[in-house]
Swiss-Prot record:
Descriptive protein name: Protein SDA1 homolog
Biased composition (Basic and acidic residues): 668-681
Region described as Disordered: spans on this chain: 485-512, 606-689
Keywords attached to this entry: Coiled coil, Nucleus, Protein transport, Ribosome biogenesis, Transport
Keyword field contains Transport: yes
Cystine pairs: none
Family note: Belongs to the SDA1 family.
Residue ranges that the Swiss-Prot or TrEMBL entry lists as coiled coil: 254-319
Subcellular locations according to the entry: Nucleus, Nucleolus
Physiological role: Required for 60S pre-ribosomal subunits export to the cytoplasm.
Cross-referenced Pfam families: SDA1_C (PF21638), SDA1_dom (PF05285), SDA1_HEAT (PF08158)
Source organism of this protein record: Xenopus tropicalis
GO cellular component assignments: nucleolus
């Protein structure tokens, strides 16, 4: 009898729903009967909206599941649900409210509701004190907007939603404003709303009075963009000379120490230039899309000066301001004295503040301001009363600051810092050497003669520009190599292609001799010819090449290879005094927009760990190990301890006059041997069992 009752369609809605989806026309009457019942239940619910109505929830889900089968009867159904939620969402039962929202999501997935109207309602429902509902609505909003823009960007819907979201971000309800901000950030990260309007709406949240909203907006501008990181990893490595090109060039010839060192030097220079071209993985695009970065940075600084937030939030403010100033090259002179107040070795998170000071420096900052910051760092950090780590951090910060603004360094201060090259602390001396290496490429004339190193073509051309001076070139530096190569190929070949070979005295020492390639000899001849040219003639040839022909990728590759050679070749007229120039690949200057904390905190020599750190490392390595002590199991676990165990725990003063102790101390060497033998035999028998 119970099975027969289950088959009655008016009371068994899941079965009726299944049948309607299969054959809608045959079950129209049953559907209309349920629809009329739904209308009556709606009227009853409106009388007491604060009380849960399970029957209404069941009917609403039934109507939502079958709405696509009878669209002519359910035209007003979505509007009825929206009006119920709009009017009664504050007093409605949470489960009832969730059911109505799920029904609307189901109708939206079937494309029976326009997205703009529904999403506006859902944004209003974010004010509800229901965490599960807010999470569901957040997921649907992000997914729905993603699906709307899947094939192509729907600008009409996007504009409507962005305008509405702009009001929601400024809503008085902190929870609704925070979730609206999270939606915009998520859509930007998914590359759906990545336009300037979205970024500038998010930027307004940086001035919110609610700390959670403020921190979320700051993190958006400071966070890393993972998609950009993946793109940079998959970037083609074919541009420019490769390591294989250098290997081929320097492997042709005798395998001696001189060629090996030349190859190592060339590989270091290549690595340096690869690092310069490597794109940053920070979220630059958002910072670049800010409409008025100068006004934005000024407002942030004003808010920072009057802020009473936690120190971590202040650090985020300083980080964002420094990035804005450094990337957009802004004039924000009040920021530098504010940062200088925190430049003390005992200051909390001082390495980050040093990073922000270097990050906010650029070549347009007046020298008197940047020199003040540099002098503060030198006076507070690079003194003998501080530890080696503090001095190292200070020199690293000075190096990064002067790499961005060379005019900040004075000749007197540079000579004082260069003397730390011979400091007893390895970290300090290596940091000072990296600073010397930086100025060998920027302006060797500021260094003392003993610190300048072997001059190269690149160092001869190095010059620090005056404040505000532009270095605009009407030619591509290094393009003269193309014209010289062309002249070389046009020369008539006088030889018949055969060369005589003889065993020289240098080759009789048993070393391997490789056949010289004609292409390598030609490249060396071209390099020698360019090196012998005066600077003006080089510029003239480079300008002629740049203006008279279109350069291919192969041409640019040759130009870059020639520029690399300038950093290796000796200056004209200089003899080879040193076989190799030391280049620390970890401490090379970078031309990126942002710095990393490792640039400031980098220590060449790892500091010794204290006892607590070593002990913590040892204990961490023992987490997966089992105890090696063999536990003796008793036949009866509840039995009392033996006399032997009691002896071990007995006070020594009670045992010192016992016969066993006295006889033990008076044993002869022979007795001890016998006792040792017996104990070893016992252990052996125990192991053999």
């Amino acid at each position: 009898m119970s099975g027969r009752n289950n088959n009655k369609l008016p009371t068994n809605l899941p079965q009726l729903q299944n049948l309607i989806k299969r054959d809608p026309t045959s079950y129209r009457e049953e559907f209309l009967q349920q629809y009329k019942h739904y209308l009556s239940v709606i009227e009853i619910f409106k009388l007491q909206p604060d009380k849960p109505n399970k029957e209404l929830s069941t009917l609403v889900m039934f109507m939502a599941q079958t709405a696509h089968c009878f669209p002519q009867y359910l035209e007003d159904f979505p509007e009825q649900l929206k009006s119920l939620l709009r009017v009664h969402h504050t007093v409605m039962d949470p489960d009832q409210r969730m059911t109505l929202c799920k029904a609307l999501i189901l109708l939206r997935n079937k494309n029976l509701i326009s997205p703009s109207v529904l999403l506006e309602l859902f944004f209003e429902l974010l004010r509800c004190q229901d965490k599960l509902l807010r999470k569901t609505l957040y997921t649907h909003i992000v997914t729905d907007i993603k699906n709307i823009n899947a094939k192509h960007k729907n600008n009409k819907v996007n504009t409507t939603l962005q305008n509405f979201m702009y009001t929601m971000v400024r809503d008085n309800n902190a929870i609704a404003a925070k979730i609206s901000l999270d939606v915009m950030i998520e859509l930007y990260r998914r590359n759906i709303w990545n336009d300037a309007k979205t970024v500038n709406v998010i930027s307004t949240s940086c001035f919110s009075k609610v700390t959670k909203i403020l921190v979320a907006a700051l993190k958006f501008f400071l966070g890393k963009d993972e998609e950009e990181k993946k793109d940079s990893d998959s970037e083609s490595e074919d541009e420019g000379p490769t390591a294989r090109d250098l290997m081929v060039r320097y492997s042709t010839g005798k395998k001696n120490t001189k060629n090996k060192k030349k190859l190592e030097k060339a590989m270091k220079v290549l690595k340096k230039h690869k690092k310069k071209k490597r794109p940053e993985v920070f979220n630059f695009s958002a910072i670049h899309l800010v409409h008025d970065p100068q006004e934005f940075a000024e407002k942030l600084l004003k808010q920072l000066e009057a802020s009473k937030e936690r120190f971590e939030v202040k650090l985020m403010h300083m980080d964002l301001i420094s990035r804005l100033v450094g990337i957009h090259e802004l004039f924000l002179f009040n920021f530098y004295p504010f940062v200088q107040r925190f430049l003390q070795p005992h200051q909390r998170e001082v390495t980050k503040i040093l990073l922000y000071a270097a990050q906010a420096t650029h070549h347009l900052v007046p020298p008197e301001i940047s020199q003040s910051v540099l002098r503060t760092i030198a006076n507070n950090f690079v003194t003998d009363r501080n530890s080696g780590e503090v001095m190292t951090v200070g020199i690293n910060a000075i190096k990064e600051l002067t790499a961005r603004c060379p005019l900040a360094m004075t000749e007197e201060l540079l000579q004082d810092l260069a003397l730390y090259k011979t400091h007893k602390d390895k970290n300090v001396s290596m940091s000072a050497r990296s600073l010397i290496q930086l100025f060998r490429s920027l302006n060797p004339e500021m260094l003392q003669k003993k610190f300048r190193g072997k001059p190269t073509e690149a160092s001869k051309e190095a010059r620090i520009h005056a404040y505000g001076e532009l270095d605009a070139k009407d030619y591509i530096p290094g393009a003269e190599v193309l014209e010289v190569e062309q002249e070389k190929t046009e020369e008539p070949e006088e030889d018949d292609g055969w060369e005589s070979a003889s065993l020289s005295d240098d080759d009789e020492d048993g070393e391997w001799i490789d056949v010289h390639h004609s292409s390598d000899e030609e490249q060396q001849e071209v390099a020698d010819k360019i090196q012998a040219m005066p600077a003006e003639e080089r510029k003239a040839k480079a300008a002629t090449v740049s203006a008279s022909r279109l350069l291919s990728q192969e041409d640019f590759k040759k130009i870059r290879l020639a520029q690399l050679a300038k950093e290796m070749n000796n200056a004209p007229g200089k003899s080879v005094k040193r076989k190799n120039i030391e280049i620390d690949s970890d401490e090379e200057e970078r031309s990126g927009e942002l710095l990393s904390l490792r640039d400031i905190e980098h220590l060449h020599k790892k500091p010794k760990s204290d006892k607590e750190t070593r002990l913590a490392t040892v204990m961490a390595g023992r987490t997966d190990r089992k105890e090696f002590v063999r536990k003796k199991s008793k036949m009866n676990p509840h039995a009392s301890s033996t006399n032997k165990e009691k002896k071990k725990n007995k006070n020594f003063m009670m045992m010192r006059y016992s016969q066993n102790i006295r006889s033990k101390n008076k044993r002869s060497f022979r007795d001890k041997q016998i006792a040792l033998r017996d104990s070893l035999l016992k252990k052996r028998k125990r192991l053999m069992k």
